[in-house]
């Protein structure tokens, strides 16, 4: 089982120079190969320059030789994936008139493969190989006599088998890394009929129903506050920056480093919060002995809907795919499967209806936002949705289980520190 971990390391000026040069060489290699793909007919090549052709044809090129061999090949492979995506979009019309992969104006990340990484078990240090041409260039140009790159971080101690290391261009003596490592996949736990169902939403990010004790609880209430705060801050800074440019006679205002920094901060804050929420949920499932987690599948929920620009912004910002990925791998570490269930009419059917289907859907029962009323009894609408998702899954899979509705009225709100 492969996992990834994002971190950063402090590096010396010499290392910053070396890594920066490799990222520069990778961007130039990308552009050379991209130009060849765009103009292969004009260049009168014998065949279309795919990855297999380019990794051989450019072996002697200047920029290729500035990188470790597998790193250079991986750069060509990333370009190949980008072109394949372009052709798929063009064929399926996923995007109208898609543009081919662009040329890189800035330095790009480089990827070290397993053969270029030396790591001893339990050590907090990695040793990375450098190409012969790069070492010669650094000695002649900058007087840098490094034979290897050594990166230190305490997270490396718990990684027995590092498969890939993605290194981003250094900034201010720091370098961001994404480490992909392998862990032993745990055995799936035996099914015991104990389920947890999850209804995804905007105001209540995850509303959960535990089939064992009938408990319902809400996770992720802080997500919308984070989104709202950063949207307001971005809007405030943009208005000031664009007004300054307009006052100077600039017709088409450009973004600023400050705005880009806020966007990055927003992404990091949301990602960190999602990790904390999904980690709490995975730990809850482990402690309570839950054998299966059922989650509503809301992919394509936004298609063909006119919901207004405010709600549209919230829907499009909802990182449901990230949630699926984070929750799936965290549960997998405990041997618990994550099952996606189509959730049509789960929020409209009564918890007492014979089945969850269009026949028994009563949208009028949702009198207010967050409130479902049936037979004069008030229930939390999101809790009813989570309850019906589990009912629908049991019906589709041919399983039977008595479920309690006592916890649907007042779900507990779980606060996870931001």
What are these regions (language model features)?
Residues 4-8, 147-148, 164, 195:
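Well-ordered beta-strand positions in beta-sheet-rich domains
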Residues 34-37, 41, 83, 87-94, ...:
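Long, hydrophobic, amphipathic alpha-helical segments used as structural scaffolds
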Residues 49-170, 313, 317:
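Acidic carboxylate diad motif detector
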Residues 1-74:
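Gly/serine-rich nucleotide phosphate-binding loop at the start of the catalytic core
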Residues 33, 74-86, 383-393, 397:
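Stable alpha-helical structural segments in soluble proteins, enriched in small hydrophobic residues
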Residues 3-4, 17, 171-418:
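Positively charged, helix-rich recognition surfaces that bind polyanionic ligands
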Residues 26, 75-83, 259-266:
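Short amphipathic alpha-helical coiled-coil/interface segments
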């Amino acid at each position: 089982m492969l996992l990834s971990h994002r971190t950063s390391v402090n590096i010396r000026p010499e290392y910053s120079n070396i890594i920066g040069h490799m990222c520069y060489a990778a961007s130039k290699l990308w552009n050379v190969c991209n130009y060849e793909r765009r103009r292969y007919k004009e260049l009168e090549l014998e065949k279309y320059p795919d990855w297999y052709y380019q990794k051989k044809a450019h072996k002697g090129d200047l920029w290729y030789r500035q990188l470790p061999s597998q790193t250079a090949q991986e750069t060509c492979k990333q370009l190949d994936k980008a072109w394949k995506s372009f052709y798929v979009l063009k064929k399926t019309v996923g995007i109208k008139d898609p543009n081919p992969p662009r040329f890189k104006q800035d330095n790009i990340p480089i990827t070290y493969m397993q053969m270029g990484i030396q790591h001893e078990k339990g050590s907090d240090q990695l040793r990375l190989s450098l190409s012969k041409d790069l070492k010669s260039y650094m000695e002649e140009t900058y007087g840098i006599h490094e034979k290897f790159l050594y990166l230190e971080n305490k997270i490396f101690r718990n990684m027995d088998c590092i498969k890939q290391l993605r290194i981003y261009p250094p900034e201010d003596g720091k370098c961001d890394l994404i480490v992909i490592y392998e862990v032993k996949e745990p055995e799936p736990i035996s099914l015991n009929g104990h389920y947890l169902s999850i209804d995804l939403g905007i105001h209540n990010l995850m509303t959960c129903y535990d089939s064992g004790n009938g408990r319902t609880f809400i996770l992720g209430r802080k997500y919308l506050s984070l989104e709202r705060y950063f949207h307001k801050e971005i809007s405030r800074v943009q208005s000031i920056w664009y007004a300054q440019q307009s006052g100077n006679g600039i017709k088409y205002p450009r973004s600023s480093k400050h705005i880009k920094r806020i966007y990055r901060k927003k992404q990091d804050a949301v990602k960190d919060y999602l990790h904390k929420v999904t980690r709490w949920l995975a730990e809850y499932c482990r402690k309570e002995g839950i054998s299966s987690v059922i989650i509503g599948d809301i992919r394509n929920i936004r298609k063909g809907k006119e919901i207004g620009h405010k709600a549209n912004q919230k829907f499009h910002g909802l990182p449901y795919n990230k949630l699926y990925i984070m929750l799936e791998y965290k549960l997998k570490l405990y041997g618990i499967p994550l099952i996606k269930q189509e959730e049509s009419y789960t929020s409209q059917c009564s918890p007492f209806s014979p089945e969850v289907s269009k026949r028994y859907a009563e949208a009028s029962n949702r009198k207010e936002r967050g409130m479902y009323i049936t037979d004069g009894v008030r229930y939390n609408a999101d809790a009813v949705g989570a309850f019906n998702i589990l009912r629908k899954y049991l019906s589709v899979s041919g399983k039977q289980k008595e479920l309690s509705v006592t916890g649907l009225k007042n779900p507990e709100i779980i606060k996870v520190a931001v």
